């Protein structure tokens, strides 16, 4: 998932092996010359406020006080709008005023459990769990339902990208997709219903087949 700052647009890219390389890297490992990446490298700290969990993820392993100098950080918020659903928000520079787009969300007040051990933090709503890895240099979040892992984010998956040539900034997330696992739907578009291998742009007001607003976006 790629979001450009202040544009209100998300690009959902579904492909095995990390297609986001086409926008920010040459191949899988080499970062394009004009891109400055900030990857979530490890868990640093957290705050619990009622049913909200805030996790701080610096851009590199913090072994000493000096490692915290001139270093960016991603702030990850976990909340639950309804039972069995976990909402994850990734932010950078939270002091900037949010200018929208604003969408009203009908939220409930589910029972949320937050448990912490030396190696992980578990955020649970109903049967759905987000498990945050606390081990040094081992950033990752696993999303599970019961005993089944649904997806995960890990090494170089969550990032904040800056294009130095254009001055544009992007928030990026890559979620694990297993072999023979498919993504369906994503709105009224004249493309195959199975969206694997496609790039799908999502707007709050996305053109439908006969109106300005697509009513089938999921």
PLM segments and residue spans:
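Short, Lys/Arg-enriched N-terminal segments with co-localized hydrophobic residues
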Residues: 4-21
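Terminal low-complexity, poorly structured segments
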Residues: 6, 18, 27, 31-34, ...
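Catalytic and substrate-binding clefts that recognize carbohydrates or anionic sugar/phosphate headgroups
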Residues: 22-25, 68-70, 91-93, 111-218
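A low-complexity, Ser/Thr/Gly/Pro-enriched, surface-exposed linker/loop concept
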Residues: 24-64, 70-119
